[in-house]
């Protein structure tokens, strides 16, 4: 029996990353969620015209939504559909996951942050991090640790010569 060829495409499956989230929050754990999109939005995602850096995730009426995410419409987008780049989009999760997130946000004072958007086969997925905000001194210690690790790597590299 012949083996099926795996379709390895060059490039990454990542559409967009929220690098600022790791700087602003302690991310406890991440949960994968689907996202409800319109046709023109999927085309824009394929061309990489999305920004999740200023987005925030919230709970309303037992459902989870993302707001502030900007998907820029393509020039060749449909003329009969009015494109709203910053509309509120619903995130798709199981009821058990939603209840778990609602409990953690209400009890533990955590917040929900969009960290990464990527493709799983032909579906756009978004990782939602359960996070706690950092104080200013936490950010300073993180930057000092990052600088020290960079200097340490430089010293090790020069000592091996």
Curated annotation (Swiss-Prot):
GO terms for biological process: trans-translation. Residues 138-161 are annotated as: Disordered. CDD domains: SmpB. It is found in: Cytoplasm. Keywords: Cytoplasm, RNA-binding. One of its GO terms (cellular component) is cytosol. GO terms for molecular function: RNA binding. Residues 139-154 have a biased composition (Basic and acidic residues). The keyword Plastid does not apply. It holds the Pfam family SmpB. Belongs to the SmpB family. PANTHER family: SSRA-BINDING PROTEIN, TMRNA-BINDING COMPONENT OF TRANS-TRANSLATION TAGGING COMPLEX. Required for rescue of stalled ribosomes mediated by trans-translation. Binds to transfer-messenger RNA (tmRNA), required for stable association of tmRNA with ribosomes. tmRNA and SmpB together mimic tRNA shape, replacing the anticodon stem-loop with SmpB. tmRNA is encoded by the ssrA gene; the 2 termini fold to resemble tRNA(Ala) and it encodes a 'tag peptide', a short internal open reading frame. During trans-translation Ala-aminoacylated tmRNA acts like a tRNA, entering the A-site of stalled ribosomes, displacing the stalled mRNA. NCBIfam families: PRK05422.1, smpB. This is SsrA-binding protein.
